[in-house]
């Protein structure tokens, strides 16, 4: 997780620098598609991974994130571990990953429309992470969260993340029919993690 966080930090630094130096040379649509979108995603992923790093590293009563229980089912562990490195590389052999947040949707206006939708959904995903606060964790129960994004739905991060994956799969589907079945497999794994 620390690796992801630092990678996102360095990506953010590069995207921020590129955005500042290139702002005046692009039309607004091109600037959005080339720089702004990547900058926003870098910020979202950096904040998300920073929260989870903190949640994994620190556990204390005064943080209200003491582990109350650990998932004791084999299926809970299997489905959770299958989604994260290094095990996700094995999962990807059976369900090849075809989704890509940075994919092009065709012309500039389609890109803007779908990328705004992706930003909205990933903002919901980030809102869910922030709602967890110091309780961020994947395989431990640190208390039921019923505030923030969790006030509206039980698994807002899983729902928004899966919707982003399906949206970014749209350009791939015309050339790769198996991508549809593969994404059903990934969505099923996240459904199993949620129940």
Task: State where each predicted segment sits.
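Membrane-anchoring alpha-helices and their flanking helix-loop junctions
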Residues: 1-139, 167-195
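Alpha-helical membrane-protein architecture signal
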Residues: 142-150, 159
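Short, conserved phosphate/pyrophosphate- and ester-handling motifs at nucleotide-, phospho-/glycolipid
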Residues: 155
